[in-house]
């Protein structure tokens, strides 16, 4: 969220993301995107992340029971084998969001600055492509 101040970008607003952690392997990831919700299972080495929310301009950092209920019901539609007894916790974070990702070069005091922010809830999805573009922009001569 620091881009609001660092880059003087008033367009940056939080997209509140809430997730649940479960010690159960779904085998593969599951994804479904609808307005205001991002339903997914992302297997990691230690847990599977169940998500999630994308509540734009919501600064709330508390885990909300109603969001957990929504996440679980949507995940169970994609992954009926989910075992709720294996839930071990959850988290909330604020993802910088804007109308479109800011991925560009700006020169500040004759120094090249590459901006790459505003992905909102699509950070995981866009990370590889954006990282490649950042590398290209950095390697281009001034």
Protein language model features and the residues they cover:
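Active-site substrate-recognition segment that forms the wall
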Residues: 1-109
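C-terminal catalytic lobe of FAD-dependent flavoproteins
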Residues: 82-142
